């Protein structure tokens, strides 16, 4: 840049000197003037009234560049003539000295005429290339000065063009003669690759984001989340979108374009990176991982690293080695993952070929097949039985559906050559189903459970774990980074999210695609740091209970009290209770501290002609196997009974669990919303008592509910638990275990619609029932329990669920009673 500045400065000086010389001579017939004019208008014309006809000859000199960059001036004489009886066209009025500058910057030599008029021309204005006319001699000093300045200018232009061509050639060589393009942070946009390679963009800021010690994690996250995540957005935007020059020659071939789901999410054929970028990466890369990245050669290429996954070519099929997938390093493990796009219909066979060739045992899927009615991933497995994809046969062995994810076990085998048939392999697919269509999960609890399951089930000597979403960068990158940073947290007691994301973006661009995903990573790490792994094998529950009853050194609390203290420290999000806090709805709330959150409140149809009639104090609650398993509701008030039954009808709830008496300690806890005999109507809903049966600790009532407007009826069963005392908790867990079993049996017969659970306020006893039902179902299915995280999840869905320390302790005791009482206990050991 300095040399360019000197050249331009030198040229400007010469022009200035020449201009000054030119102004010292009065214009005459032979004087040549240096001006700057438009290339489309070589001489300005001015109409003046005259009885004679005139012609103006303008001699222009403009540099013409030949292909070999030889500069030669071409002389063009512009002749403007106009023949008229009463008018002439004269030369533009002359100016004494100075330089006239036109917008396009082309320099011309124009002959000036003071009073001379040439011979008239026949016809209209025309332009012809001629040789310059000879004019009477005059002082040639200014002409020489102008020509010197012009020659100097042409030399400068020539030098600039040569320098530009040399620099362009250098960049072209650095691109390895392939299509290269860069991607920006944020959402995927379908843009065509550039034909000219661009240098990798440096981070947009020089600000450093060093690794964080885990004991500073909470403080730093709170600081960066202030002002609507301002500092987190700055940190995310500082990430290099692609810290290397992406060479995607194979992905850009015509034969492979249809294999890519998004045109700007492509795997790298090889990695080319500047020396500065290599140094920056090495500063933030652990020593073990640095060995995997490799050394840069003299051109700044990482010659020993190829992140694109190569398939074994199929004979006779061009470019059959291509699949949109990239190797990604783990924390200290080379190529731990393969980040892939979600298979398309035409690439499913290639996907299974990759699974077989890479000896993969675990597939992680972080998208649903369709989101917002848009196909995100082709279903690459059969629903049941077996199916053959190319030369790989896939059969479904087992499917387990849980609230946050589904686990599928496949048996795969290569087909074709019977004599050389390979043995069968077991593949486990972990399909995370709780990622919302927009944004990120509202809590990282489900993702951490999911990740732990993946880590535990992946065989030690298996190939790379294949992770895919739709594009294979956003959610995929989020999963990979959380996995790596948890490993780093355990190994070094610190995390380096910024550094690790920067490094894996050198293997696949746009890994971790949005600032929301970036913040979610930090939230997951903080969740793990604050609460740890609280899952227990059922065989270790008794030992755990003995441990948590012991006092914690340095405190007055035991372990159980400390656990519950952590739960009560979870902030209640009062700003997310808008509808329940509306003046028209306040009278519908029994307890003002327990109002449903906006994101999961139960909505009922608006009554025609009446505003604010879609509200009821009730929340959807997730269970063990499915979302919205429960409706946690307050006990109806006298004026909200109709809303309660409208909710039951709208959401097809066939089971109601009541955990309070109508009156306790002289106070009304719940309005009676069913008839003692016969039938009663609440608006369009009619309720008829068909049967009532007393059990050991609860009453079962069979109710026929009819919607008179729709002229339809349903059978509803109410389980009214009497074993909860007015003060404290039940003396044992037997009654609770029995009613949970009865409700689950009813659900199997009536369909898995939400179970409506209520006490008085719909939090303490209601939360305890939901927690126990969820925990016991998992104990039966997996032999694992996690009371702490179950209650924590409930409290994130509705305020004050499991309201007291006694209720929290009761959850542990009931689970222990269940394990001790049932013969299935032998299976847990």
UniProtKB/Swiss-Prot annotation:
Its main location: membrane. It is a single-pass type I membrane protein. The active site is at residues 469, 759. Residues 79-106 are annotated as: Disordered. GO terms for molecular function: protein tyrosine phosphatase activity. It is an enzyme of class 3 (hydrolase). Widely expressed. Highest expression in brain and kidney. Gene3D superfamilies: Protein tyrosine phosphatase superfamily (3.90.190.10). Residues 167-829 are cytoplasmic. Its EC number is 3.1.3.48. Residues 232-528, 560-818 form the Tyrosine-protein phosphatase domain. This is Receptor-type tyrosine-protein phosphatase alpha. The gene is Ptpra.
């Amino acid at each position: 840049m300095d040399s360019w500045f000197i050249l331009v400065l030198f040229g400007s000086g010469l022009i200035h000197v020449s201009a000054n010389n030119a102004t010292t001579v009065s214009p005459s017939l032979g004087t040549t003037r240096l001006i700057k004019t438009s290339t489309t208008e070589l001489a300005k014309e001015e109409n003046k009234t005259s009885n004679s006809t005139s012609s103006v000859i303008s001699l222009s000199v403009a540099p013409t560049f030949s292909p070999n960059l030889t500069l030669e001036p071409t002389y063009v004489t512009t002749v403007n003539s106009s023949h008229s009886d009463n008018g002439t066209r004269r030369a533009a009025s002359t100016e004494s000295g100075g330089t006239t500058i036109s917008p396009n910057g082309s320099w011309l030599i124009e002959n000036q005429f003071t009073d001379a008029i040439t011979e008239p021309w026949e016809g209209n204005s025309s332009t012809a290339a001629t040789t310059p006319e000879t004019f009477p001699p005059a002082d040639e000093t200014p002409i020489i000065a102008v020509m010197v300045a012009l020659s100097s200018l042409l030399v400068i232009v020539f030098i600039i063009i040569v320098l530009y061509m040399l620099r362009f050639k250098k960049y072209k060589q650095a691109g390895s003669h392939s299509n290269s393009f860069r991607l920006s942070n944020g959402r995927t946009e379908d843009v065509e690759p550039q034909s000219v390679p661009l240098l990798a963009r440096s981070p947009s800021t020089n600000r450093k984001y060093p690794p964080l010690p885990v004991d500073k994690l909470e403080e730093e996250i709170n600081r960066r989340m202030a002002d609507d995540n301002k500092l987190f957005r700055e940190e995310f935007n500082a990430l290099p979108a692609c810290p290397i020059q992406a060479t995607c020659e194979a992905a850009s071939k015509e034969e492979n374009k249809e294999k890519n789901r998004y045109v700007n999410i492509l795997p790298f054929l090889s990695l080319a990176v500047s020396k500065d970028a290599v140094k920056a990466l090495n500063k933030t890369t652990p020593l073990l991982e640095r060995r995997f990245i490799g050394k840069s050669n003299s051109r700044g290429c990482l010659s020993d690293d190829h992140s694109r996954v190569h398939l074994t070519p199929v004979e006779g099929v061009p470019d059959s080695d291509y699949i949109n997938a990239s190797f990604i390093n783990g924390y200290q493990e080379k190529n731990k993952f393969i980040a892939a796009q979600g298979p398309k219909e035409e690439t499913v066979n290639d996907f299974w070929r990759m699974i077989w060739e890479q000896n993969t045992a675990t597939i992680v899927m972080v998208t649903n097949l369709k989101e917002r009615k848009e196909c995100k991933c082709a279903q690459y497995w059969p629903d049941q039985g077996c199916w053959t994809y190319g030369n790989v046969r896939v059969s479904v062995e087992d499917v387990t559906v849980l609230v946050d994810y589904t686990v599928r076990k496949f048996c795969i085998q290569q087909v074709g050559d019977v004599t050389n048939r390979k043995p069968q392999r077991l593949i486990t697919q972990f399909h995370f189903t709780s990622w919302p269509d927009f944004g990120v999960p509202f809590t990282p609890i489900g993702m951490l459970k999911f990740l732990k399951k993946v880590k535990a089930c992946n065989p030690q000597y298996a190939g790379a774990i294949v992770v895919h979403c739709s594009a294979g960068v956003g959610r995929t990158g989020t999963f990979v980074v959380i996995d790596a940073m948890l490993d780093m947290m355990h190994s070094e007691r610190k995390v380096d999210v910024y550094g690790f994301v920067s490094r894996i973006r050198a293997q696949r661009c746009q890994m971790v695609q949005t600032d929301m995903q970036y913040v979610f990573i930090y939230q997951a790490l903080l969740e793990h740091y604050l609460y740890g792994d609280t899952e227990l094998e059922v065989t270790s529950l008794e030992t755990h209970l003995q441990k948590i009853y012991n006092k914690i050194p340095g405190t007055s609390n035991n372990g159980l009290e400390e656990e519950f203290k952590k739960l009560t420290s979870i902030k209640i999000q009062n700003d997310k209770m808008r509808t329940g806090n509306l003046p028209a709805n306040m009278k519908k709330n029994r307890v003002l501290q327990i109002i449903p959150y906006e994101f999961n409140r139960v909505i009922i149809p608006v009554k025609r002609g009446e505003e604010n009639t879609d509200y009821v104090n009730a929340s959807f609650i997730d269970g063990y196997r499915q979302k919205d398993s429960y409706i946690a509701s307050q006990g109806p008030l006298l004026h909200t009974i109709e809303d309660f039954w409208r909710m039951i009808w709208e959401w097809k709830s066939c089971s109601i669990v009541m955990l309070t008496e109508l009156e306790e300690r002289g106070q009304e806890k719940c309005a009676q919303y069913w008839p003692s005999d016969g039938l009663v109507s609440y608006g369009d809903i009619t309720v008829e008592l068909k049967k009532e049966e007393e059990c050991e600790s609860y009453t079962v009532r069979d109710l026929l509910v009819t919607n008179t407007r729709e002229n339809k009826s349903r059978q509803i069963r109410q389980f009214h638990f009497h074993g909860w005392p007015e003060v404290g908790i039940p003396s044992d867990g037997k009654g609770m275990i029995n009613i949970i079993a009865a409700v689950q049996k009813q659900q199997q017969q009536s369909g898995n619609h939400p179970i409506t659970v209520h006490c008085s306020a719909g939090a303490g006893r209601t939360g305890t029932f939901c927690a126990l039902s969820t925990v016991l179902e998992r104990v039966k299915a997996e032999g694992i329990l996690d009371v702490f995280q179950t209650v924590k999840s409930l409290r994130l869905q509705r305020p004050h669920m499991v309201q007291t320390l006694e209720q929290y302790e009761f959850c542990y005791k009931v689970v222990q009673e269940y394990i001790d009482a049932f013969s299935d206990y032998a299976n847990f050991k």
